[in-house]
């Protein structure tokens, strides 16, 4: 329980008491022994105690007040007093309650303060040491402010004080120079102009504090770390050669500051140490966090206000980094703090600069993942990251792609593991990160695309022209021949109701295996409802919820987007869609960009249908499709129509197509009945009757669904629930020509099996 140093100190105290024939072992004996204990001695030094004076006072008190054993009683030994025993017990209890295993000399020193009536506690108070000072040092390494300079003008801080300052730096900062020496920092590639400006600012006489401002991921922290790396390598001007960069850990600085003034004391001591070491530079990452850090509720004294006086005088040098958003929203509002820094804009590097950066970092990643990156793979990582990963910036997102490609290669089974990462591997990683199809079309995808048109024509009848336009646009995009900054395709499907405009898009999403994002435009007829697509502006209800359209595309960037019955929407919706069709992006109310470059945009409309249904004059049927297109031109503005890839007119369904529709509905019904164990047979006469009954040129295929429901599904429902088809069976549907109605033959599963056996 007691550590070895404390046991040695206690043994020395008993030996001293026996040597002087003292009758009792007192708390003063204990404190005198602790002056030689490393742990207790360090705590007392941190509290600025004059150890020599304290030792003299203790020795004098012990000699004057402690009873001495008579020479005649040689057998009697020195006995510890009750107060001595209580001090050790309290130290043990205190350590146990804090979850530690060993009692140190510093813990015993804390316990001495509980013996208020003892001379030892009095002498500690006399030297301006409180129990809280010792506890703070044990828990957090907090030292009392060092006393003013000694009356002796030639006195210099001793080595112990210097060691205390170094320890304080180690507790609350990270030495980036030391980290660079052991290989913990990647080398800085490029950024010569920014680094040169930062060094110039650091060498100024006053206000020598550079502030690196840029978007997240552009390499602000890398510049500060790279400066430390170059100092270690000796690749800096002479005036910077002896500098050491410390990175501030604001979390450690705040941790454990329970009482008012703890944080200020700790931070002031750190600043004083930096001020004394003229070659030290403090790097504060996310420097906007110091505004308000350590401030009590309602108080104005925070880390920013504590550091301001030293910043303008040039006594300490600070490098800060923050983003444009935090700089304008938080940092710049404290004008007094902002003027003490020299803003340096860190812009996003170009593609060529990023390639150079990754080539410089490549050996580190190759050694870590045990792979090799080809030159084409590095360039592909940068170019694809720029093209498809829009929520981050170079070089960070390109480095992420390289790193993840190496990790993916490393995690492959040994039999499939490759030693080289090529362009195809990079494409696969980018496709997973951005949730888009791979640039290189696989064999399975190639088969899907080849048979896409035929598959859609088997599911949607009579609209071959529309299907061909859709599939050709998708094939061009997957072949890499589409517009780089536009959606895969932007189509307006026009035509009468019930002919398959919506069904084509539904079947397209199923065939490609991608998400269908469907928006019914009848919900956006009012002007104020348009904001729901991109999010409400600040001050309005729903501002924090984002936009329905932008959120859906951000979540599913590779999808089929269906805007159903677009003519019912407010005209402002058309204006929102202009930039989507032209530039492939849409910004929501929070500034997030939704990427539509891998979206198939389909809009449906019934505009112009009324013109096609006008009665013809005379015996010849007139083609009114030209009038229908004129109606579409009236509703949709020229700039809207000009951005569409195609306006596809869906024709009325012919009688031949209706027979195919009947067959499709019967197949769908059979699939439902298969789950019940029921087989369905419909004669050709019955199919012809259903086609004749359900055909309506103006209404399309929707009346057919109602005819199937009334004439097939309703009679089957009662038999499935209460009749002969409860346990399965067979249904035969035929036509009674005399009555001109359908007849139904139901056969239970058991009877069907018996007849089959005979």
From Swiss-Prot:
Provide the taxonomic classification.
Bacteria, Pseudomonadati, Pseudomonadota, Gammaproteobacteria, Enterobacterales
UniProt similarity note: Belongs to the ClpA/ClpB family.
Q: Which UniProt keywords apply?
A: ATP-binding, Chaperone, Nucleotide-binding, Repeat
Q: What GO biological process terms does the UniProt entry carry, in alphabetical order?
A: cellular response to heat; protein quality control for misfolded or incompletely synthesized proteins; protein unfolding; proteolysis; response to oxidative stress
What does this chain do? ATP-dependent specificity component of the ClpAP protease. It directs the protease to specific substrates. It has unfoldase activity. The primary function of the ClpA-ClpP complex appears to be the degradation of unfolded or abnormal proteins.
Q: Its gene?
A: clpA
The protein's name is ATP-dependent Clp protease ATP-binding subunit ClpA
Q: Which SUPFAM superfamilies match?
A: Double Clp-N motif, P-loop containing nucleoside triphosphate hydrolases
Q: Which species does this protein come from?
A: Escherichia coli (strain K12)
| Gene Ontology cellular component annotations, sorted alphabetically | cytoplasm; cytosol; endopeptidase Clp complex
Q: Which CDD domains match?
A: AAA (cd00009), RecA-like_ClpB_Hsp104-like (cd19499)
